[in-house]
């Protein structure tokens, strides 16, 4: 992809009307199950073969003359993560031994789009490529995290500033399809938000559930909701804003100055309220919302729509982690069907 190739040139330098849900918020599951090949073994193999594109980039375009250390900094079975320490500073590297560059290309485009808004801090992506042992990598700016998630008020304000700054004249969608967790996320440009959210978010997840679990009951009810949800948007002014797309607590931090940092996006241009879809796993407080709505005013019917945006992520968690999330998703659907008399 030409757009991603350009990155390699960068150098480091609730109201009563709302449905009443019975689901219980829970922590997002860990993905640290056994992986087919560890990042360390892949790196060792590449070093032995003398074919390490990560080191090659760092020692050329990364402007380092030597790498002083490589340390693991977590990750899971989707990706592994390392910090490369050099005489030109540190680099954050993610690798995946099974998936080609397209996943990281989507991440890089999202990071760069958010970075270019000059609003909230995100790591700048430098390079995406293939690994000779199979799989792919992404090199990006290393941000030293502080001791906390930072100030909730600042997070709300800066997130709203990003939404306000980055609008799309192409409609709703993104330049490429990407992933939400490991689930494909379809981002075909669409002029109408309700159509986009119906087809490429709720509808797509419901189809996956049917394919993977044969759950026709949730599919049928979900389709009834999609067909009848238009009244939830009456009076709302909607514009395609750049969204992080997967804003849960694990993707929110702060730098050593206490400024908020967001990472690991699943970006697309969408209705700004959709950004709160992972709020059940993000810990947003009153200060966050107050500061956010000072910049991006709350639209009529916000409370009625809030759980509609939670639904996308509950359906995705059903697809990713199994039927433990089914009751939460079905609860939201049932409550909306009652409210809409559908």
Swiss-Prot record:
Enzyme Commission numbers on file: 2.7.1.172
Main location: plastid
GO CC, alphabetical: chloroplast
Listed GO MF terms: ATP binding; kinase activity; protein-ribulosamine 3-kinase activity
Class of this enzyme: transferase
Catalytic residues identified in the record: 246 (proton acceptor)
Swiss-Prot/TrEMBL keywords: ATP-binding, Chloroplast, Kinase, Nucleotide-binding, Plastid, Transferase, Transit peptide
Family matches, as Pfam families: Fructosamin_kin
Targeting signal (transit peptide) range: 1-46
Entry-linked SUPFAM superfamilies: Protein kinase-like (PK-like)
Subcellular location: Plastid, Chloroplast
Record field: catalytic activity: N(6)-D-ribulosyl-L-lysyl-[protein] + ATP = N(6)-(3-O-phospho-D-ribulosyl)-L-lysyl-[protein] + ADP + H(+); N(6)-(D-erythrulosyl)-L-lysyl-[protein] + ATP = N(6)-(3-O-phospho-D-erythrulosyl)-L-lysyl-[protein] + ADP + H(+)
Highest taxon above the source species: Eukaryota
InterPro entries, alphabetized: Fructo-/Ketosamine-3-kinase, Kinase-like_dom_sf
Binding site for ATP: 141-143
PANTHER family: FRUCTOSAMINE 3 KINASE-RELATED PROTEIN (PTHR12149), PROTEIN-RIBULOSAMINE 3-KINASE (PTHR12149:SF8)
Family (UniProt): Belongs to the fructosamine kinase family.
Function field: Initiates a process leading to the deglycation of proteins. Phosphorylates low-molecular-mass and protein-bound erythrulosamines and ribulosamines, but not fructosamines or psicosamines, on the third carbon of the sugar moiety. Protein-bound erythrulosamine 3-phosphates and ribulosamine 3-phosphates are unstable and decompose under physiological conditions.
Protein name, UniProt field: Protein-ribulosamine 3-kinase, chloroplastic
